């Protein structure tokens, strides 16, 4: 059973929980940057993060629960992993969920554009199966963030994003109709939003 935490401005955590004979047999914890790139704990410059992942995994198996102590020096990561494991255990419980999606903010990533070699990362906030907030950034091939004031569609990128956001709040999650003059942005945004929705699924 796999689930994700709420996304912060800097990262998002995921958990894969293995259940055997009704018990937690194993837990794999991962963490991703705000560019939706998985952190390699063997090279990541904050060693507490990798240590926290290993320690919390073992503690959760021992406790048969997500109810473990926050790892000192990795509070944000620990909180996210605990939430992700709690959500995975909800999926494993067999109880029919009330909603299709968990309430929260989820980080999605689009495909890479064949036109410019960039991809889009979006933060999608859900409540009662509706998108209630949305923000995005474009990650360039050199892994810098596109300045949103740059004109890309004959109008500033930020304006196109706002048009998409307005449509996203009003439409079925993940299915915004093509915005005139910003076809590529619409398709890429929908792809990234659906990726975030996949992370938010309650079963």
Can you describe what each PLM-predicted range is?
Residues 104:
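Short, conserved active-site entrance elements at the starts or edges of catalytic domains
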């Amino acid at each position: 059973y796999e689930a994700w935490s709420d996304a912060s401005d800097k990262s998002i955590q995921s958990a894969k929980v293995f259940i055997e004979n009704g018990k937690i047999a194993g837990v794999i914890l991962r963490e991703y940057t705000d560019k939706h790139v998985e952190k390699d704990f063997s090279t990541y410059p904050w060693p507490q993060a990798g240590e926290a992942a290993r320690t919390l995994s073992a503690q959760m198996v021992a406790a048969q629960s997500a109810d473990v102590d926050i790892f000192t020096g990795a509070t944000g990561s620990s909180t996210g992993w605990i939430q992700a494991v709690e959500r995975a255990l909800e999926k494993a419980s067999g109880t029919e969920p009330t909603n299709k999606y968990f309430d929260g903010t989820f980080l999605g990533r689009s495909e890479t554009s064949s036109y410019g070699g960039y991809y889009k990362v979006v933060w999608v906030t859900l409540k009662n199966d509706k998108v209630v907030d949305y923000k995005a950034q474009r990650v360039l091939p050199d892994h810098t963030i596109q300045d949103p004031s740059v004109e890309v569609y004959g109008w500033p990128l930020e304006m196109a994003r706002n048009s998409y956001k307005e449509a996203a709040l009003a439409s079925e999650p993940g299915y915004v109709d093509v915005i005139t003059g910003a076809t590529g942005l619409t398709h890429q945004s929908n792809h990234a939003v659906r990726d975030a929705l996949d992370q938010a699924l309650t079963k």
